[in-house]
Regions:
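ALDH superfamily catalytic-core signature
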Residues: 1-121, 184
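Conserved C-terminal structural/oligomerization subdomain of aldehyde/semialdehyde dehydrogenase
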Residues: 6-7, 12, 61, 88, ...
Length: 225
């Protein structure tokens, strides 16, 4: 799992960031390890970000993935649906506010409505652990160092994101994140860049020179010294 953190500074492009966050709902219904499921938003743009996410969710049509217009398909099994729903319920029990979703769609299949939980804190189970479903949690920060602290407060570190109005600032934040990959003002990975995680998100790298080395054999020849 990744439990990806997405940091938003006060001068970021909110629409661009929300477009990236919404991929959690639509891209494999959140069943992807690089999903930006933990939103860490500057307090000055918190309300606008939550409102924009709510408005965006209204376009996330749930249904058969083979049908035109469907943006959110089912999760893989009934067991996994129940697991994701338990994460949502734990967030509610811990005091999170359900902005959208939180309920099971009235249709056959293993569907979960795109869910947005606001008012979250880093001690909540739904914030700390990987639900692996269409669930986004939002926390606020009061500055870059606080945002970095919240982002790094995780057992995982696969893919993180920074949306900022200043490129130098974005790079400075990225270099302090305990994450194997960081994307700046985008959610798209670079296919030539090494891919892998820190902490419980794994060891080793795929892609790039590092990925090729993983498929190579290393021979050591020893001689008397």
């Amino acid at each position: 799992g990744g439990k990806g953190a997405l940091i938003m500074t006060e001068d970021c492009d909110i629409q661009a960031a929300v477009g990236g966050i919404a991929s959690v709902w639509g891209f494999h219904s959140g069943q992807i390890c690089t999903a930006p499921t933990r939103v860490i938003c500057h307090k000055s743009i918190y309300e606008e970000t939550v409102a924009t996410l709510k408005a965006t969710s209204e376009f996330m049509t749930v249904g058969d993935a083979r049908e035109e217009g469907t943006l959110v398909g089912p999760v893989i099994t009934e067991t996994h649906r129940d697991r994701v729903e338990s994460f949502i319920q734990s967030g509610i029990d811990d005091g999170a506010e359900v902005i959208v979703g939180g309920e099971r769609p009235d249709r056959d299949g293993y569907f979960i409505a795109p869910t947005l939980l606001a008012g979250c804190n880093p001690d909540m189970h739904v914030v700390k652990e990987e639900a692996f479903g269409p669930v986004v949690v939002v926390m606020s920060h009061d500055g870059d160092e606080h945002a970095i602290e919240l982002a790094n407060d995780s057992h995982y570190g696969l893919f993180s994101y920074v949306y900022a109005g200043n490129t130098t600032r974005a790079y400075d934040i990225a270099q302090k994140l305990e994450s194997g990959n960081v994307a700046l003002n985008t959610i798209a990975p670079h296919m030539y860049a090494p891919f892998g995680g820190f902490k419980m998100s794994g060891v080793g790298r795929d892609r790039g020179r590092w990925g090729l080395e993983a498929y190579s054999e290393v021979q050591a020849i020893n001689w008397p010294s």
